[in-house]
A protein has these predicted regions:
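Hydrophobic packing residues within well-ordered alpha-helices of enzyme cores
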Residues: 2-5, 84, 172
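A contiguous active-site-proximal alpha/beta segment in oxidoreductase catalytic domains
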Residues: 1-27
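A generic structural signal for residues located within well-ordered alpha-helices
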Residues: 36-39, 140, 160, 164
Length: 183
């Protein structure tokens, strides 16, 4: 779904991501930021192509010792603002990212593998559903990685990009700790 949308992403101004799921009873030794939100952080960094300059974050531990729900607001040097929510204590599973820019609005639903595009057409709004080939993202990531190893070509996500997403996730955790404990 993301691949179908990428061709339309030019200069994001606002991004909103929701990645919610029921309690997993596994992986609760790390916060929802490292377990769940990191996937959206990686995608947002790739789409915005700008450094975050401000981080506001709040996380709450509800059923496990680490944060089970978190919300972060990122302001980027480009002026883009991204608001991300991740939860592993939701009643339903939602995996969606919405992207707003001056010429269009994109809604990407990972779970249902759909992409909707809305554009201004004169005095009307033209909506279209983009063609998406249903795929399993984890299988795609592993296949792409194996292909990179076998062919000695760069992977789809470089080590630097993965490290940047991890570094941002760790900064978010520090901000959440500071808000929660004042340190």
């Amino acid at each position: 779904a993301v691949q179908a949308a990428r061709a339309y992403v030019t200069h994001p101004r606002f991004i909103e991501a929701h990645r919610l799921s029921p309690y997993p009873f596994r992986g609760t030794d790390v916060s929802v930021v490292l377990d769940v939100m990191i996937h959206d952080l990686d995608l947002v960094l790739a789409l915005v192509r700008s450094a975050p300059v401000q981080i506001d974050a709040l996380g709450v531990a509800v059923l496990s010792p680490s944060e089970d729900i978190a919300n972060v607001r990122l302001r980027f040097a480009s002026g883009c603002v991204a608001n991300l929510t991740a939860s592993r204590i939701s009643d339903e599973s939602i995996r969606r990212i919405r992207l707003f820019q001056e010429d269009c609005y994109l809604s990407i639903d990972y779970k249902h593998q759909t992409v909707e595009l809305a554009r201004k057409a004169g005095r009307a709004i033209r909506r279209q559903t983009l063609a998406v080939t249903p795929r399993h993202p984890l299988d795609d990531e592993l296949t792409a990685f194996l292909h990179a190893v076998r062919t000695h070509r760069p992977p789809r996500v470089s080590g630097e990009e993965a490290r940047a997403a991890l570094a941002l996730a760790l900064k978010i955790e520090r901000v959440m700790r500071h808000v929660r404990y004042g340190r």
